[in-house]
Amino acid sequence: MEDFNSQYANHSKLEQLKQFILEHGTYIELKKGEQFTIQGKVNHRGAYIEHGLLRYTRVDEKGNIHIVGYTFSGEFTGSLCTLIAPDQPSLVTIEAVCDTKICYMPYSKVEEFFAANVKIMQLKCTLVEQSYLLMYHRLLDMYCKTTEELYLDLLNRCPDIQEHITLK
């Protein structure tokens, strides 16, 4: 599904969360190659990407590194596992592909935001629902699309990605 990440990040119900992070979070610039999250370590923060590109990788049991996704400007990033279960280590490493400006916030502050009232708590449900839909679409794409189709989808989402990475 083309541009599903953007549809998820720009979901109308998540606008409040985005604004909260942008108003109360901390802005930093990740340099190319700098890691935001490390596989196997507990990550206590999530972020909104102002501009730039982040790559998600996972190291398998044999030590091979697999690229499992990207997030782009205008999207959320972080370890959903840690948001749901705070002591759960990250399943992926998230690193900057190019200089990337993000606004991050500790998950504890995000949880305080969610706990403000029932209506805001529903935002957490929306976040988890949208994350599930995103992952389900990616799973279906992985099984149903050819490598070429996945490549074209990535180019459609981010036409200038070839300036930052080598696509094999």
Where are these regions (language model features)?
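Well-ordered beta-strand positions
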Residues: 29, 47-48, 95
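Polybasic "coupling" helices that flank or enter modular domains
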Residues: 96-97, 108-168
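A short beta-loop-beta micro-motif enriched in histidine and acidic residues
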Residues: 23-24, 35-45, 64-65, 87-90
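Cyclic-nucleotide recognition modules
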Residues: 67-125
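Conserved short histidine dyad/triad with adjacent acidic residue
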Residues: 26-41, 71-75
